[in-house]
Design a protein with these regions (language model features):
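Short, mixed-charge low-complexity intrinsically disordered segments
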Residues: 18, 31-53
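Short beta-strand/loop motifs in extracellular/secreted proteins, especially
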Residues: 2-4, 42
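Acidic, low-complexity, intrinsically disordered interaction modules
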Residues: 13-14
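Conserved aromatic
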Residues: 23-26
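A short beta-strand micro-motif
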Residues: 4-10
């Protein structure tokens, strides 16, 4: 199964963080990334991972 997560640096402290949301579609992850960028966060990246259960 493929999942997508969004990583970013906060605009206030510059700390590296991972979004709490996990997405099954890249399109949804890109929407989250766009929102984070519009809120001033930097180095916003969509990361693709393969997981097995």
């Amino acid at each position: 199964m493929t999942i997508y997560i969004v990583t970013f640096q906060t605009y206030e402290t510059g700390e590296f963080q991972v979004s709490y949301n996990v997405f099954s579609k890249r399109k949804d992850a890109e929407l989250e990334a766009r929102e984070l960028r519009s809120n001033g966060h930097t180095k916003v990246t969509v990361v693709k991972r393969e997981v097995r259960f």
